[in-house]
Amino acid sequence: QDPDINWRHVDVMLIHEDEIEKEIFISHSCHHCEEPACMDVCPVGAYIKLENGIVQPLHDKCIGCGYCIVACPYGSITKGKDGKAQKCNLCAEKLERGEEPACVAGCPCDVLKLVDSDVSDSAGMEKEMPGFKRFFTKPNIRFYPRMKRNEFIH
């Protein structure tokens, strides 16, 4: 993977709360969708879905057509210097060693977590958040309920 590519992006979203328009920030990368559009449109099968849910690009198979880039509703795929599609693979090699993905380990605010979908449902995490668009791909992303100012989770 190309080290010059940023796999995470922070977007500003506008929400209306208590009749006031507010800005919130969401950090996202590949959502490792249940029904990944990138995988569906790839003419050479350069994506596979692993048992753990990771949508894994197969760099050697990629022909650089860019169909997956256009198909991803979250803009999570880009072309590398070699012209082939690249995306977050959730640091699959780190997970195999029992380590956290780089984004989770390096998050300065400790807000990114890697959790099993069964745990996320029982932990009160939500699939929806104001401003976040859930598309037909069924993204595997969950949100902690938004905290009001001066509320903290310990």
What would you call each of these model-derived segments?
Residues 1-154:
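Non-ligating segments of multi-cofactor redox enzymes
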